[in-house]
Amino acid sequence: MQKHLINNNIKIRILDSNIKKNSSFFLPQYATPGSSGLDLRASIKKKISLPSKEVILVPTGIAIHIDNPYITALVLPRSGLGHKNGIILGNLIGLIDSDYQGELMISLWNRSKNIFFINPYDRIAQMIFVPIIRPTFSIVDDFEETVRFGKGFGHSGVQ
């Protein structure tokens, strides 16, 4: 296997002094042995409110550098926040490129009718790492016809 496909050492910078003091608790971590996503926490000093239908940008207090163009990180909503409280990501999915080195910021959108409160170091999102395929393109005049060919949305029906 090619080296770039097996290198999964991600560099992390701790930007929040409280995280530095207790990094084993505040760093991204898997909640259970079977978890796919690493929990990301709100690096805030005091409780903040997120009014109904509003969007807010919340810092995590960390920065990562993936440094491998064949790996990317996806920031996803936490299922409980979305289902129970109507809190999802403002951009639906966050894409962290391998060369990005800035602080991870979480765009939270309150789609509920109620004010939502975020406490310091609440788990607000999750992050997964996925492999990336970087294709090359070949310019052609025509495609070899398939059964589907150019049929678009809904072409196969619902049953």
UniProtKB/Swiss-Prot annotation:
Residue sites binding substrate per the record: R78, S79, G80, N91, L95, I96, D97, M105
EC category: hydrolase
UniProt keyword annotations, A-Z: Hydrolase, Magnesium, Metal-binding, Nucleotide metabolism
Matches recorded under SUPFAM superfamilies: dUTPase-like (SSF51283)
Reaction(s) catalysed by this chain's protein: dUTP + H2O = dUMP + diphosphate + H(+)
UniProt-listed InterPro entries: dUTPase, dUTPase-like, dUTPase-like_sf, dUTPase_trimeric
Example GO molecular function: magnesium ion binding
Cofactor: Mg(2+)
Pathway assignment: Pyrimidine metabolism; dUMP biosynthesis; dUMP from dCTP (dUTP route): step 2/2
One record GO biological process: dUMP biosynthetic process
Pfam families per record: dUTPase
EC number(s) recorded for this UniProt protein: 3.6.1.23
Family under the similarity heading: Belongs to the dUTPase family.
Function summary: This enzyme is involved in nucleotide metabolism: it produces dUMP, the immediate precursor of thymidine nucleotides and it decreases the intracellular concentration of dUTP so that uracil cannot be incorporated into DNA.
Protein name: Deoxyuridine 5'-triphosphate nucleotidohydrolase
Species of provenance: Buchnera aphidicola subsp. Schizaphis graminum (strain Sg)
